[in-house]
Amino acid sequence: MTYIVTSEFELNQVAAPNLPLAPVQYTPQYIDQLNNVLRLYFNRLDAILAQLKVGVGDIDGSGIRFSYGAFSDLAYTTLNGGINNSVTTITVVSTTGFPTAGQIRIESEVIIYTGTTPTTFTGCTRGARGSANVAHSTGVAVTKIQSPVANTAVPMYMNTTDFSNSVTLVDTTKLTAAKAGLYNLQWSGQFNNSDTTEHDLSVWLRINGVDVPASTGFVAVVSSHGGIDGHLIVGWNYYVQLNAGQYVEIWWSTTNEKLTLECYGPSTGPTRPSTASVVATLSFVSALP
């Protein structure tokens, strides 16, 4: 089986040459026809090397593009005005990147909201997930969090497509493959524990809504200490078999609602960039066995 790189830098099968039948007696026309068929075939094969080369004599496969997708979850803003401990509409600089309903953290307070406008969170439930409802000053950070009820299975959500070719993010949780194959799924999560006790979480996979056997991993996240929340970034990889159009999701649960997945905005002392709560990549490895 022979393949050729198309103008889109993807490998497509090249059909074997359709050689003309040889006549009983030699004819110049047959030789010309045979030469033309073979010349066309080998010219197409030469195109493989021509598009894979990055320099004179170099062949490293850099011209090939396989199926892949890289996705993350990141949303943060700041308060646009101070708030007391009871208001249910919170004004911020922007709600871009936040879901229409979800959870946010302002300092140590977790808030559940049911709606958004371009600059407000509405229908807020203050002091959620065991936190205290308190007043906050203008300009403090507001970050998106993922915080399930204790011992409840939920998927990990993502809101950003960083890179994609034939692998897409559907409904904020489903890493969907357009082409069948064996894929490498790599993920990491930034976990936050605001409780004074260490808590556990578990992470596993579902393919098309069905739990994948032997995919669960268990992690313990350290407790808060010295007034600072416990933090832990964890991750590992899986090989998954997907048919065309199938999707894989990352699911998790925690033993305590004070253990959350959290984004963070840029920080100082020293200056550091923002932090995504979830990062996941799905990369084609091979055709199905």
Please give the residue ranges for each predicted region.
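Short, surface-exposed tryptophan/glycine-enriched loops
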Residues: 226-251
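Short beta-strand-plus-loop segments that form exposed binding edges in beta-rich domains
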Residues: 251-257
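N-terminal low-complexity, intrinsically disordered "leader/linker" segments enriched in small/polar
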Residues: 2-65, 69-70
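Beta-strand signatures of extracellular beta-sandwich domains
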Residues: 112, 202-206, 249
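Extracellular and analogous surface-interaction loops
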Residues: 92-96, 171-182, 238-244
